[in-house]
Structure formats: structure tokens, C-alpha cells
Amino acid sequence: MLIQKIKTYKWQALASLLMTGLMVASSLLQPRYLQEVLGALLTGKYEAIYSIGAWLIGVAVVGLVAGGLNVVLAAYIAQGVSSDLREDAFRKIQTFSYADIEQFNAGNLVVRMTNDINQIQNVVMMTFQILFRLPLLFIGSFILAVQTLPSLWWVIVLMVVLIFGLTAVMMGMMGPRFAKFQTLLERINAIAKENLRGVRVVKSFVQEKEQFAKFTEVSDELLGQNLYIGYAFSVVEPFMMLVGYGAVFLSIWLVAGMVQSDPSVVGSIASFVNYLSQIIFTIVMVGFLGNSVSRAMISMRRIREILDAEPAMTFKDIPDEELVGSLSFENVTFTYPMDKEPMLKDVSFTIEPGQMVGVVGATGAGKSTLAQLIPRLFDPQEGAIKIGGKDIREVSEGTLRKTVSIVLQRAILFSGTIADNLRQGKGNATLFEMERAANIAQASEFIHRMEKTFESPVEERGTNFSGGQKQRMSIARGIVSNPRILIFDDSTSALDAKSERLVQEALNKDLKGTTTIIIAQKISSVVHADKILVLNQGRLIGQGTYADLVANNAVYREIYETQK
């Protein structure tokens, strides 16, 4: 997959390889020219020194320029590949259902799209900057070193075997450690994210010490993994250098006697030592890159898990159509992923177009679950849900989204403007449509008090608005598309009694033909509904008007009595 991404930048990659070739040629020629300069100096051929020296400087300049261009090209390729991977991953995540998101965990996905892709980006960068250069430099330096002093070939082989052997052992040991490191990084990110989002709860219940202890436990474990990896490499790198410098010392000691009989051999020794140093450099860099490559391989596997994941739900690839606003549940049973007990059990009911229907029940009765099944955020394991007489699994996503709109209990706004947030409900919503939706949601008053009205900025998560204002904008977003079925999942809970009453009056007046489903904790929110559904422990145990249920349904009557 990574190779396919790099192919997108094939011309930059080819140019980078050309620059790599020039860099290697420069590195291999410089010791040879240095050898010739020393030879000319020792033999008194001073005229040759200038011409050879000019070539030496020219070759060095070519290598320097090629190196600079290669850095630019490598950065371009690495940034492009990481951007493409990040976009592919985000695009795939957009196809995930609620169940898929819960399986991966939101914090986990954030780490994969940031830290893991950064690891891959770094390795792609180093691949074009260094990795392609190493085998060419190693082979070229080995051949030229042996050619310069053939009798010392075994010194190079011994050094290479020792260093590569240790590197192979360390790579085998480090792989599991890097995987553990990534897992701990996910956990520490999840804890930090959870605490930052829930800072009010932490402060309210004086949980700072407990949360800090929880964070510290994972942080210490992460530190332990990092220290282990650091200690391991603190042993490996000095050992590599020790072997390398030992090889240099051994080479000089072995040829020391040759200098006395033939002083011109000094140039050969200098050239040999330079080539030996380049061999040491390549091996040390392989060890260094091994660390990064190990991390990147694990990161690549984690990105592939996202890209290769099969969404738990898919929509039919068929043309959009118009559906009427009737709704029916037929023997629906639903269990959340990872749960054993069903949240909804054999639920059946029918709602006619234009009806206002309330859904009540104790906490945990399955009210919000029922609401989330209608826009197909989850699929039931048994039974069928039909809108306009059609199973919602047999219609396109576009059809379902324009037919059903849901206002969630927790108002979530995105950074941008008020208009940007309302247009999430309908992408091409006009100012008139937004005004209408804001009026129904009782949001017009505070929006028009703002200098830029609908173009006023919304900060991340809507932190510059009160809870009630965010909830009213969330309601307006649900209304703006004028859906056939509108669901309120206890979404008026943040409103005061007056605002809630005004919203309900506006809904009755302006959305008369819309099928409205109100999930409510308070009986007063659904007292005027055409029909009320009563849920208890996942089962539908009653349905009827307010008066019928007060008279005939014990659970409803109990809720009513506690709220009088």
C-alpha cells in the first residue's frame, strides 16, 4: 500500500534517486581523490595537486547540492504520502457506523491518524534521504576499500558480521516493545482526552488526585518502555562504534610497517580508512533506521487495520427516492456490540405520517437506543424497521438522511460559523431556511443579538455558547432540512420551561406534517402527543394517549406520580 502511495510521486521519487546516485558517487570519489593528492604531495608532483584538488572540490560541491535537493524532494514525497494516508483513513472512518467507532475507540483512531502517520512520514523521509543511499554506499565503499588494500578484506567482513549480528538480535527484541509502546500511547491519550472533556466533573467531585494517579500509572509504564528501548540502544550504538573504531585501529596497525618501506602508501591508508568510516556509517545508520522502521511497520499495520476494516453497516447503491413519514418497528431486538443482554426486546409499533409520538421510560429502558435505530446508526439483530413501508436497510443513505433527522441529547457543535453548523443539516440551506429553523428552535433572538448573526464564529465544541444556546442551534440544525421524520432524543433537557414550551408550540404550528418523535424523561414534554410509547427494561409495555396510559398502565402511572 505504501509503495502505491509513493508511485503518486514517481517523478519526485526518480529525481530523488538521481540525487542519491550523485551523492553516493561524490562520497566514493572524494577518498580516491584525497589518496591521489597525498600521493602527489609525497612524491613531489606539486603541479598535479592543483588539478586533483579542483576535482576534489568540484565533486564535493556536486554532492552538497545533490544532498540539499534530495532533502527537499524527500520532504515533498513524505509530506504528500502522509497527507494521502491521513485523508484515506479519515475518509474510511466517515463510513464507520457507531459500532465500528466503539470497536476502535475514538482516542485510538486519533492516535492512529496523528502519531502513527507521523511515524510513517518520518520513515518515508529517511528512506529517500538515507536508506536508498546506504546499500550503494556500502557496496561501493567495500569494493574500493578492498581494491585499495586487498590484504585487509577480512577486517571489513569481521566488522560487518559483528555489527549486523547485534542489529538483528536487537530488532527481534525491540519489535514487541514498540507495539507495547504504541498501545500505551493510545491509553495515555485516551485518559488525557477524557479528563480534558470531563474537567467539570473532575473538579466538581474533587477527583484530581484519583485521575492524576490513573494518568501517572500509565505514564510510568510508558516511561518504563521508553527507558528499556533507550537503554538497549545506548548499548548498541557504542558497541557499533567500538567495533568500527577497532577495525580502523587494527587496519592502521597492520599496515604501519608498510609506511617505512613505501611512504606513498600513506595515501592508500587514508583512502582505506575513509572507506572504512563510510562502511561504519552505513551500518550504524541501518541500526538507527531499524528503530524507526520497526515503529513504522507497526504503525503501517495499524493504519491498514482502519483501511481494510469492513464497515458493520453498508447502504444500497441505488438512486435516492421520496418516502412518506410513516414508521414501523416489527419485532425489533437489538444488542449493543460487546454486550450480552439485548437493549431492546421484540419491540413492535406503528406511527402514521404527521403524528407526534412520545417515548418515555425509566433510565436504561432503551429510549435513546430506539431513537438511534431509526436513522440507522445501528442495525437490529432481529426484526425490521420500515419508513414509508420500506425496510431502511433497502434504501440509499441519501434517502434516509433527507427523510430522517435526529437531534441528540448532547448538543455537539463544530468550529466554524453558526451557518456552517446549521448547513450540516442541509448543505445548501438558504438564509430564509436557516431563519425559519432558528425561529422554530427559539434561537433567532440570541443569533440576531450577535454582530455577524449567522456568520458569527463558533469555537471548538461551541464553548462560546451556553448549554441552552447550543441545544437550540442543534434543534435548528435538525429542523433546517424539513425532514419527514424528526426525532428529539431528550434534546430539550438543557432548555428552561418557557423555551421548551415555545419550541413545542412552534413545532406543532410550523411542522404539522412532520412525524415527530420525542424521547423524554419528563411526562410534561409529551403530554400533548398523539401517542405515547412506554418502555421498560427494553420492552414496549404500553402505548396510547396520556389519559389512557394514566388510567391503564402501571409503569406510566408511576412515572407520572413521581413527577407531579
Language-model features: locations:
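A short amphipathic helical element positioned immediately N-terminal to and/or at the very start
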Residues: 1-8, 109
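Transmembrane helix-loop-helix hairpins at lipid-water interfaces of multipass membrane proteins
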Residues: 7, 11-69, 73, 146-151, ...
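An intracellular "coupling" helix at the cytosolic face of ABC transporter transmembrane type-1 domains
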Residues: 8-10, 95-99, 115-124, 128, ...
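Hydrophobic alpha-helical transmembrane segments of ABC transporter permease domains
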Residues: 18, 26, 48, 66, ...
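Membrane-embedded alpha-helical segments of multi-pass transporters/permeases
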Residues: 28-32, 68, 72, 138, ...
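Short intracellular "coupling" helices and adjacent cytoplasmic loop segments at the cytosolic face
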Residues: 43, 79, 87-111, 115-117, ...
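Helix-loop-helix
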Residues: 45-48, 58, 144-161, 228-302, ...
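ABC-type nucleotide-binding domain
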Residues: 322-564
